[in-house]
From Swiss-Prot:
Its EC number is 2.5.1.19. 3-phosphoshikimate binds at residues 26-27, 31, 170-172, 199, 314, 343. This is 3-phosphoshikimate 1-carboxyvinyltransferase. It catalyses: 3-phosphoshikimate + phosphoenolpyruvate = 5-O-(1-carboxyvinyl)-3-phosphoshikimate + phosphate.
Length: 431
């Protein structure tokens, strides 16, 4: 699945100038798969998806739906979802390292009439899941286990009702419950009881997509979501390009002083990663919308910066790479990201370790990182089987000759084409 050979990160001695097309959004693809599955399971009919991302995370979601007895047809970015929830005996769902599968599929499995066992990669066993399982128990769903592996004993239906959950470790707890809530007999009310929610815009994305499927959702009260019971409308879904994956390429323009154009950039996206544009503009970058494309022209130089990434934690590795490559001596403070300690790896510890390994100066705080830009040296950059860490290493390698990413294959989680796209971007600029 992942490369075991170190990957020499391409060095860019001159500004990068490139046009890049990134595949569909992982967040949208996996949400549309679940919504399409629920519509089919209710007997409402089949749904189609175009622009779907095909990567390890989305393939794991497809396999999870198929394990539950649903049909997902199509081999590329065009998919059709149909069928009913009829799992085979001794059904097992492999979550891999995909948080969306780990947290979106169990409420769906609760609607089955059979036991479903969930497991995943070794690193996935450290990812937070207990609050979601406790919430399912609170809704009357028998669940064995407090973490991977665990078993959901479906009874064919879920009564629904009101459930309190501390989602401060992951907004996906809320999204996972909301996605299936309309299929519960009495609907669902979710009340967040913990500290400030991370990645709240991802919940807003879930709510918007539920409404597009005809679901009545009331989110007028902060930290409370009410999903009324009802049918999900089968429909055609069109996934936007994955803006989080695009961020690494935009960062290439910033750190090299070049120009990168992303094709198909949506004019009004529901993806939280669109907020990267505000960050890039504070770094003296020029952002232009040209027809259906987004173009970022990097500056000659930029200084350190302060940014709260609570709503866009997925951007942290790329933003940390930007901070490490800022003008020497300048300081960046990345805040609001304590929850990243429970992502694919402890991203705060990983970023601090890898930046410092190359001679940088990165310190952890209670909720983030403080990075003082210093000249970096060649060396190995560990990915920790984390796609975003691998991409961050590639960004650093643009300005530091001799950086090797130990596992660039980790990018297959959300962008299998990353090594090829990255190399083409750099090599296409060298002439």
């Amino acid at each position: 699945m992942s490369s075991i050979e170190p990957w020499p990160a391409p060095f860019a001695p001159t500004p990068v100038h490139a046009t890049v097309t990134v595949p569909g959004s992982k967040s949208q693809t996996n949400r549309t798969l679940v919504l399409a599955a629920l519509a089919a399971a209710q007997g409402q009919g089949s749904s189609t998806i175009t622009g779907a991302l095909r990567s390890r995370d989305t393939d794991l979601m497809i396999e999870a739906l198929q394990t539950l007895g649903l049909r997902v047809d199509g081999t590329g970015s065009e998919l059709t979802v149909s069928g009913r929830i009829r799992p085979c005996p001794e059904a097992r769902v492999d979550c891999g390292l995909a948080g969306t599968v780990l947290r979106f599929a169990p409420p769906l499995a609760a609607l089955s009439a059979a036991p479903i066992t969930f497991d995943g990669d070794e690193q996935a066993r450290a990812r937070p899941i207990a609050p979601l399982l406790d919430a399912l128990r609170g809704l009357g769903v028998p669940v064995d286990g407090a973490g991977l592996p665990f078993r959901v004993q479906g009874t064919g239906s879920v009564a629904g009702g009101t459930v309190a959950i501390d989602a401060s470790a992951s907004s996906q707890f809320v999204s996972g419950l909301l996605l299936s809530g309309a299929s519960f007999t009495d609907g669902l009310t979710v009340q967040h009881t913990g500290s400030e929610l991370p990645s709240a815009p991802h919940i807003a994305m879930t709510v918007q997509m539920l409404r597009q499927a005809g679901v009545d959702v009331d989110d007028s009260i902060p930290n409370r979501w009410l999903v009324r019971p009802g049918a999900l409308r089968p429909r055609h879904w069109d996934a936007e390009p994955d803006l989080t994956n695009a961020v690494a390429f935009l960062a290439a323009a910033v750190v090299t002083g070049g120009t990168v154009t992303i094709t198909g950039w949506p004019a009004d996206s529901v993806q939280p990663a669109k907020n990267i544009l505000d960050i890039l503009q504070t770094l003296n970058s020029t952002v232009r919308h040209i027809d259906s494309c987004l173009q970022v022209q990097g500056p000659q130089s930029y200084r350190g910066f302060d940014v709260d990434l609570r709503d866009v934690g997925e951007l942290t590795p790329s933003v940390a790479a930007l901070a490490a490559l800022a003008s020497p001596g300048s300081v960046s403070r990345l805040a609001g990201i304590a929850h990243l300690r429970g992502h694919e790896t402890d991203r705060l510890a990983a970023l601090s370790t890898e930046i410092n390994r190359l001679g940088g100066n990165c310190e952890q705080t209670s909720d983030g990182l403080v990075i003082t830009a210093t000249p970096l040296r060649p060396g190995s950059w560990r990915a920790y089987a984390d796609h975003r860490m691998a991409m961050a290493g590639a960004i650093v390698g643009l300005r530091v000759a001799g950086v090797e990413v130990d596992d660039i294959g980790a990018t297959s989680k959300t962008l299998p084409e990353f090594p090829q796209l990255w190399t083409e971007m750099v090599e296409g600029s060298s002439g």
